[in-house]
Every structure is written in C-alpha cells, then in structure tokens.
Swiss-Prot record:
Residues 374-435 form the TRAM domain. It is an enzyme of class 2 (transferase). GO terms for cellular component: cytosol. This is tRNA-2-methylthio-N(6)-dimethylallyladenosine synthase. It comes from Sulfurimonas denitrificans (strain ATCC 33889 / DSM 1251). Transmembrane segments: none annotated. Catalyzes the methylthiolation of N6-(dimethylallyl)adenosine (i(6)A), leading to the formation of 2-methylthio-N6-(dimethylallyl)adenosine (ms(2)i(6)A) at position 37 in tRNAs that read codons beginning with uridine.
Length: 435
C-alpha cells in the first residue's frame, strides 16, 4: 500500500513468540498503518522479539541490536519485546540507549501505546491479556497458531519463564473456538494450539467462564467441519492423565505427534529440577501412548549437565533414549538463568564434562534418528503442503510430523496428497505423489 510505514520484525525462540509477533504485526497494521518488510534498512520501525530460556539468545540480542542500529535508516525506531524484555527491562536501554522502547512478553497488546512514548518500558508480568481481542494476522494462510493460555505456574528450578510470562491463565474457550473458526474460514486446514503447559488448560481463568479441560477443548475444536488437523505444544508429562491420552489417540483430527519434554532420564535429577514426575511415570505415559496410538511420533527436550548430574544420572538419560527411541530430540547444556533456584546450586558440572556429555547424547540421537528414518522408505504418508522453494520442491508434514518434500508447484499449497517416500535425509524425506 502506497505511503504505509515499514515494519521489520525479527522473532527469536518459541512458537509462542511467533504468535506474539503476529499479534504485534496485526496491531501495528490496523492502528498505526505499518506493513512488514524484509529490508531492515528501509524500515521505520524495527522490532526484535526475544527469548530468554538460555543464555545464548540473550547475548545474541545485544549483538543484533548493534547491527540494527548501524543499518537502520535515520529516524527509525528500535523496539525490544518478549521474554528478555520482561527480564532485563530498563537495563536494555541502559546498555543500548538507541532503543526506543521495551515491551514485555505479557504486554503485547500495548504495542501501539509504547510506540508513542519516549524510551518506554512496559514489563508488567501480572498484566492480563487472556481476554484481549487481537486483530487477526497470520504469516501462513494454511496453518493457524492459536494461544490457549498465557504464562506458567510451574516452578522448575532451571527455568525463567514464570518470571517473564507471569502466572498461567487460560484463554476463554469461546474465544479460542471463535479464533479457530475464523482461521478455518480464511483457508487454514490445520490449527496449532500454544501454551507453556497446554494440557493444564482450564485450571484458571481470569473471569467467570465455563471450566473446560484440555481434552474437552480438543473435542469441541474437532467439531469444526472444515478443520482437518489439530496440533499442540507443549504438554507437560505431569498432566498426561488417561483422559488426555485417550482423547489424543481416538480423535482422528488430532495429529499423532507428541512433544514430551523429558529434560532428564534420572529421577534424582528430575526431583532437583522440580519437574513433578519420575522416570517411571514418564515411561508409563509413553507406554500407554504407544499402546493406544502405535504410530505416534514422540519428540523431547533434554538438558545435560544439570547441577549435580552424575555419570550414572547421565547414563540413565541415555538409557531412556535407547528405550523410547524419540523421533526428535532438542538437547542443550544446562545454562544458569538469573532469578532461578538452580542459579544458586553449587554442584556445577565441569564444562569439559558437560560438552562431552552433550556430544555423546547428540551422537546417540542421530543414530536413533537414522535407524528410524530407514523404516519410512517405501511407506505412504498423507502430507499437508505449506511451502514451495525456488527449486519447485513443495514441502509439508505428515500426520506424525515427518517433513516431506516432492517436486511440485504452488497448486499443492494448502492441499493434502498421499506421498510415497523414495529417499531419506536426516531432517527431510523425499517422495513422489501417488494416487
């Protein structure tokens, strides 16, 4: 649109940050007349939406800010949003005085307000956005990310999220259903539900609302006629009761892909982390899940070298990896975060030992993945296509979250096709359309 102001936004971290960025784009477009651009040097407003789960993204923030400040055009504003904004607040402006405003992860709806204030810092983690009606914007016309809760009530000793996103509040069911219906009317055939602990949905609402469990929410969403697929992240192993597993397994619209954040295979370490479950509970849930849904793919998160992790504890983690054979593993060395309980733990694992353990774990993960990928060769999967690259390969995901590409055109985008796997790679499978 002629004369519209330009917005450049970079998003770091999780899917919830991606959805927050979509919310900010919608607000700035509707209320302030901005349109997005991929050209930083032409932008009138530059936003970096940050992550603070580990130390590395925080360090990256100030590196990126320096680059942005050098490349921005005269008069352009720079804003810092998200979890690091919530955590560091005014310190960001002290360290980078060219930053125009700082907006916390719990205050996304105030983006237009802070934009017009000089060096504004808005980081109230108790601010309630659970009933705020955001204007609609989606980066993909084929899939809709939908928040079902904000914040987190867990007290994991390593995690800073409760300090940056506040207490957990469920978004009213009627708002979620309305957003899903609107997305489907707009052409989306898949919705992706977001929350820190999605299967704890319904525990607390900010107002008087019908108490609906996560399993019941899934049932209601699946009644939307043109909606074909439902995904979600992340469920907490502690809340994986039988009702949830049964609904997941029996509901044909729910994709058979589950992210189960293990964090450690040692019950002792899990207790130190205050995860709320044991190794035995986790394995029991996996066994129940696979008994009811044999083709389910299971991904996980693992932290190595948590304070006090012994060689025996680490071996227990490797053992559970061999037993479960996760389809994907996101693994990290423990990174102490400020204002967390574990920051004060003194039994720190030696850095060389930590690095060695991470390498060992990742090598095992690759071996497991390579073996599992071989089993896909020759099989047929129903793929929902969402992307087309410049070489005219269309890619999408199967029900169990395999990333699959075929030679094709934009006519495949937003469509389902049966694909026979003809070649396997570590991160993407290749195939040909059949039928």
């Amino acid at each position: 649109m002629q004369g519209m102001k330009k917005l450049f936004i970079e998003t770091l971290g999780c899917a919830m940050n991606s959805r927050d960025s979509e919310h900010m784009i919608a607000e700035l477009s509707e209320k302030e007349g901005y349109e997005t651009t991929n050209d930083l040097s032409s932008a009138d407003l530059i936003i970096i939406n940050t992550c603070s789960v580990r130390e590395k993204p925080v360090a990256k923030l100030f590196s990126e800010l320096g680059v942005f400040n050098k490349r921005k055009k005269e008069g352009a504003k720079i804003g810092v949003c998200g979890c690091t904004a919530s955590h560091l607040g005014e310190e960001i402006i002290k360290r980078a005085p060219y930053v125009s405003f700082v907006l916390g992860a719990r205050n996304v709806s105030k983006i237009s307000e802070v934009l017009h204030k000089e060096r504004a810092v808005e980081i109230d983690i108790n601010y309630d956005e659970s009933e705020f009606a955001f204007n609609d914007f989606r980066t993909s016309p084929y899939k809709a990310y939908i928040n079902i809760s904000i914040g987190c009530d867990k007290s994991c000793t390593y995690c800073i999220v409760p300090k940056t996103r506040g207490e957990e509040i469920s978004i009213p069911t009627e708002l979620i259903l309305r957003e899903a219906q609107k997305a489907v009317k707009g052409g989306a055939k898949e919705i992706f539900l977001l929350g820190q602990n999605v299967n704890n949905y319904g525990r607390r609402f900010s107002g008087e609302h019908e108490k609906v469990s996560f399993s019941e929410l899934l049932r209601r969403l699946s009644k939307i006629d043109a909606l074909e697929r439902i995904r979600f992240t992340s469920p907490h192993p502690f809340h994986m009761d039988d009702e949830f597993i049964e609904e997941f397994s029996s509901n044909p619209k729910i994709c058979k892909s589950m992210h189960m954040p293990l964090q450690s295979g040692s019950s002792k370490v899990l207790k130190d982390m205050k995860r709320g479950y044991t190794k035995e509970w986790f394995l029991n849930r996996v066994q129940k899940l696979r008994a009811m849904s044999p083709d389910v793919s299971i991904s996980t998160d693992i932290i190595v070298a948590f304070p006090g992790e012994s060689d025996e504890d680490f071996e227990e983690t490797l053992s559970i990896m061999r037993e479960v054979k996760f389809d994907q593993i996101f693994s990290f060395k423990y990174s102490p975060r400020p204002e967390t309980e574990a920051e004060h733990f003194t039994n720190i694992v030696d850095e060389d030992v930590a690095s060695s353990r991470l390498t060992t774990l990742q090598n095992l993960a690759v071996n497991i993945l390579d073996e599992k990928n071989k089993t896909h060769l020759g099989k047929i999967y129903r793929v929902y296509f969402e992307d087309l690259n410049q070489d005219y390969y269309a890619s999408g995901r199967s029900d169990n979250n395999l990333l699959i590409k075929v030679k094709g055109s934009d006519e495949l985008l937003g469509e389902f096709r049966d694909v026979k796997i003809t070649d396997i790679g570590r991160t993407i499978l290749s195939g040909e359309i059949v039928g």
